[in-house]
Amino acid sequence: GAILMLQPALNYGCVHPAEVDRVIEVIAALGLRGHAMPGENRTAIGITGNKGAVDPAHFENLPGVADAIRVTKPYKLISKELRPEKSVVKVGNAFIGGTELAIIAGPCAVENSDQVFRVAEQVSKSGAKFFRGGAFKPRTSPYAFQGMGEDGLKILADVRDQFGLNIVTEAMDERGIDLVEKYGDCIQIGARNMQNFSLLKYAGQTRKPILLKRGMSATLEEFMLAAEYIMAEGNYDVILCERGIRTFATHARNTMDLSIVPAVQRLTHLPIIVDPSHGTGHNYMVNPLARAGVAVGADGLIIEVHPCPEKALCDGAQALTLTQYAELVDQVRKIYELVAMSEMAFT
């Protein structure tokens, strides 16, 4: 692969869209695909679709091209080589990866309207802008509650209409992606589907942002390449999520790998959030690991909340009560402010 750096046009202040289009046409004529990534001071175009090495010399003399660089990493579009500044992903009417801590909260599974609306009221009151809830549930047992399907998505759409919250919910197959695209604001690809490559390609063809969860035994490079699959299809609005990995430890459902947060941020411009609910599996661990995730630099949290966790049809052991959730939000926001202040002090 290769990256082309375009210089701002004189008297225009930034790269002229017509120049970007011209360069992409030349790339397409060579049987390749160009991916434009506008930045603050420049526009980069990533080139994919090549079977072998791309010779940057092909593009160096094109109008507007300031530099052409060969990319050596197996992933191109997610790389900081392509976009040094951080990407901010718009989800509905709010943002993930910007200056505000993103909090995505709600029940593991949509069970009924009353349950969902009770949680949504608290989530809205807390100032969070995103609501999670599963309408399609991948369960280890075929006899466990599998979710309400499209009826559940309709309830989530009602939550958006009433509370103004942006809906994040999982799709397990192509039909699910079509339905979530219709009713939701962000499509979640779960840990078990992180390497379902046909599903990743299909997700890359949608117009909705994708929340990609790390597989339970995925390496950093496998995680990065899964995101690359989505972006290579043209969907550049990808949010990464650490949700715990499988280890020998038995004291928690999974092991939260918080070291992945700075590792990801060193390599990619994509935002990354953490899921301390699935990452621990225990109610009493969620708040400490949420605080730690924010302290280590995560862009947001995804938290499971239920009005009566002991009656939950799915993952009740890791759900917070409404009161516990309110306490968590207050604490993590203070930590986020401290982290932001300390980063400013050291730069």
Listing of model-derived features with the role each one plays in the protein:
Residues 101-107, 129-133, 167-170, 185-189, ...:
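Hydrophobic faces of well-ordered beta-strands that scaffold small-molecule active sites
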Residues 100-118, 141-147, 166-170, 190-191, ...:
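Active-site mouth loops of central-metabolism enzymes
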Residues 148, 163-175, 185-198, 209-220, ...:
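Catalytic beta/alpha-barrel core
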Residues 18-103:
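Non-catalytic terminal accessory/regulatory regions of metabolic enzymes
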Residues 132-150, 307-317:
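Glycine-rich, proline-tolerant flexible connector loops at the mouths of alpha/beta enzymes
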Residues 1-17:
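Active-site segments that bind and position negatively charged phosphate/pyrophosphate groups
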Residues 145-169, 202-209, 258-273, 318-341:
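Alpha-helix-loop-beta-strand connector modules within alpha/beta enzyme cores
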Residues 91, 206-305:
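Catalytic alpha/beta core domains of metabolic enzymes, predominantly
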